[in-house]
């Protein structure tokens, strides 16, 4: 089995999908988890205004609407959280995403004060936190906030990790990668777009240039620039297609380099890293 075949199998990516079937599959998955864990009453997710959180958020909202209808229990709710660092440049996109998602509850927690306090505390020890490291601190602070809300509201935190992100390890370890449940896992980037289109989303919600936007010295840095490869190339690879050798080398390089992100903390019995 080639490395490409191994990755496709591990991530569960299909070469093509029926968007409506995958929408149903994700909603049923989220519902089944709640039914198995009756002490859980909410799903919590940070909404950035990007494709992935918009899709996961709408799926979560539909899940809770079905749970209420089926059980008569109005405590089943989806909590969407805006988590800006100061003023977000594309706040209008985040508001458009919320308008589409129509969450039961919408909260805002600005992470600037807490993030800056952490940076100052580190710097006070004679270190100088880099802009890149600070960006990761922002992602982790956002997850701290989501778990704080989930803990108060009998909730589980939804993550937005999908196959095109997972293969490259393009997420912050213990940040956006530290969720409880991943309804988009198995989908590549273009398949996520197909689900949003099937859900009736305005195309501006899934055609905007993807960016983590964590680094202040590189505002709005496109994912594809940071990765050195396009999502179309990543998606083609995940669908089993032949892509150019340079792009394949880059993708497989990311897969190998970020293996630690896809594992629990390394123990003496692990050998994947050797």
Swiss-Prot record:
InterPro entries: NAD/GMP_synthase, NAD_synthase, NH(3)-dep_NAD(+)_synth, Rossmann-like_a/b/a_fold. Belongs to the NAD synthetase family. The lineage of its organism: Bacteria, Bacillati, Bacillota, Bacilli, Lactobacillales. Catalyzes the ATP-dependent amidation of deamido-NAD to form NAD. Uses ammonia as a nitrogen source. GO terms for molecular function: ATP binding; glutaminase activity; metal ion binding; NAD+ synthase (glutamine-hydrolyzing) activity; NAD+ synthase activity. It comes from Streptococcus suis (strain 05ZYH33). Mg(2+) binds at residues 52, 165. This is NH(3)-dependent NAD(+) synthetase. Homodimer.
